[in-house]
């Protein structure tokens, strides 16, 4: 049975990255530096915009985060793809948390809009994904809408984030 708490601290997320939270061969988060949040502050199978679940996570922004040194020299900004990846990570975590079996893979999204950027002067990033649909057949597929806020202002919006869980031997095509 998966670990079904509603809050996960950094050490819990690392355990997930090592494959210890949802069992061998099941959903894992990436390990640092690609783990893009410090904690999950809420996860439920109800609620959210569509009433089918929500995941909310936070990243404490520090000027020494690895990507600021290389993206870009003398013009540091968090790559937008990392914020997007964080939302995919959260959908995959939700699928494992809700009992889905298999390894997670991002499968795409419908639409993405950036209206700001995460700078090293920011204090906190909040990510939110609202689960729209979960399909469980040979493939476990989650679809969600998400947003990223920096210091309280929503600056990314993603529609139809898709993540699949694949059992050993099956691969996304």
Swiss-Prot record:
The keyword Lyase applies. One of its GO terms (biological process) is unsaturated fatty acid biosynthetic process. The active site is at residue 71. It is found in: Cytoplasm. Its EC number is 4.2.1.59, 5.3.3.14. GO terms for cellular component: cytoplasm. It catalyses: a (3R)-hydroxyacyl-[ACP] = a (2E)-enoyl-[ACP] + H2O; (3R)-hydroxydecanoyl-[ACP] = (2E)-decenoyl-[ACP] + H2O; (2E)-decenoyl-[ACP] = (3Z)-decenoyl-[ACP]. Pathway: Lipid metabolism; fatty acid biosynthesis. The keyword Lyase applies. It comes from the Bacteria. Transmembrane segments: none annotated. GO terms for molecular function: (3R)-hydroxyacyl-[acyl-carrier-protein] dehydratase activity; trans-2-decenoyl-acyl-carrier-protein isomerase activity. Pfam families: FabA. CDD domains: FabA. Keywords: Cytoplasm, Fatty acid biosynthesis, Fatty acid metabolism, Isomerase, Lipid biosynthesis, Lipid metabolism, Lyase. Necessary for the introduction of cis unsaturation into fatty acids. Catalyzes the dehydration of (3R)-3-hydroxydecanoyl-ACP to E-(2)-decenoyl-ACP and then its isomerization to Z-(3)-decenoyl-ACP. Can catalyze the dehydratase reaction for beta-hydroxyacyl-ACPs with saturated chain lengths up to 16:0, being most active on intermediate chain length. Homodimer. Belongs to the thioester dehydratase family. FabA subfamily. This is 3-hydroxydecanoyl-[acyl-carrier-protein] dehydratase. It comes from Bradyrhizobium sp. (strain BTAi1 / ATCC BAA-1182).
